[in-house]
Amino acid sequence: MYEKGEHIVFEVSGPLTILNVLIDPKYVFKGMRKKPELMARIFAKLGKEILAYMKLAKEQGADFISYADSSGGVNILGPKMAEQMVNLFTYDFVKQAGKLADEHTMILLCPKTTFALLGTGKAKLIDCQIHDDRSQEEDSLSYAEACIRMKGKYVLQDRCA
């Protein structure tokens, strides 16, 4: 596909979404409350495997690696547990994942992960201008077109506090 000019997007799920498929989430949430050290080890193990998976995607030519942990949003976890998750896993994981970003590969974060990082003060939002040389009569850039133009210009790890 890449040889034909297509852009490759590889989607990766976070640990809460993965665990949500394997076991009842109430046990994960209970573990986070009662045994945070154990959950930290579990999340670290999953994070290591997810990063290895992302690295393989990059090596195979993925232009974009999209990370989402939809089960980890504030609307599901609540503010206190969402903050715990950011401190326990998400912040360090995103910093490591950001190291995979370069002029060939861009790391995309789902809005829930982004807002969790912003809400805990672990990241800041930077408004990026994209030059669009089309006339005003034409449609504006799509999200995909904007991502393609941004690739290689903004590295994720530089965006975390």
What are these regions (language model features)?
Residues M1-A161:
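Active-site loop segments of alpha/beta catalytic cores
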